[in-house]
């Protein structure tokens, strides 16, 4: 289900340089705070952006293990959404939709407008699962 046009990793040089610099700094934070789920999830997003799929998945999954929603509904819900973004960015639509379907149920989950408009979710546009999640959040007509 992966398509080069819908995954990250083939970034223009200036953007790749920015992601690489961000990765260096974020990796320092993870080394200082190895049990910080948020820091690890952000590192996973950066790695997804750089096309480092295995690292991104490992970091995102580890972050969700460190901060499950049954331990912290707000921040754990946010970590689930980060894992969904990682899935979207590496072309794993199943992972992205599975996690996003869970993440939208929490207060920190993305809104209808965010899913509809933010480019973060562009890799999933047109995927029936994603479109179903978006439609489920649509406001009721007056």
Predicted regions and their residues:
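Alpha-helical protein-protein interaction modules
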Residues: 1-142
């Amino acid at each position: 289900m992966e398509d080069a046009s819908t995954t990250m990793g083939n970034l223009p040089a200036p953007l790749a340089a920015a992601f690489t610099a961000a990765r260096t700094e974020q990796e320092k934070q993870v080394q200082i705070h190895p049990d910080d789920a948020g820091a690890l999830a952000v590192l996973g997003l950066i790695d997804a952006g750089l096309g480092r799929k295995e690292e991104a998945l490992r970091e995102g999954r580890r972050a969700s293990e460190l901060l499950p929603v049954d331990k912290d509904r707000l921040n754990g819900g946010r970590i689930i959404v980060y894992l969904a973004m990682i899935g979207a960015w590496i072309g794993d639509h199943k992972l992205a939709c599975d996690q996003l379907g869970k993440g939208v149920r929490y207060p920190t989950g993305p809104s209808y407008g965010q899913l509809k408009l933010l480019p973060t979710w562009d890799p999933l546009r047109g995927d029936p699962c994603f479109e179903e999640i978006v439609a489920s959040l649509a406001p009721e007509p007056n």
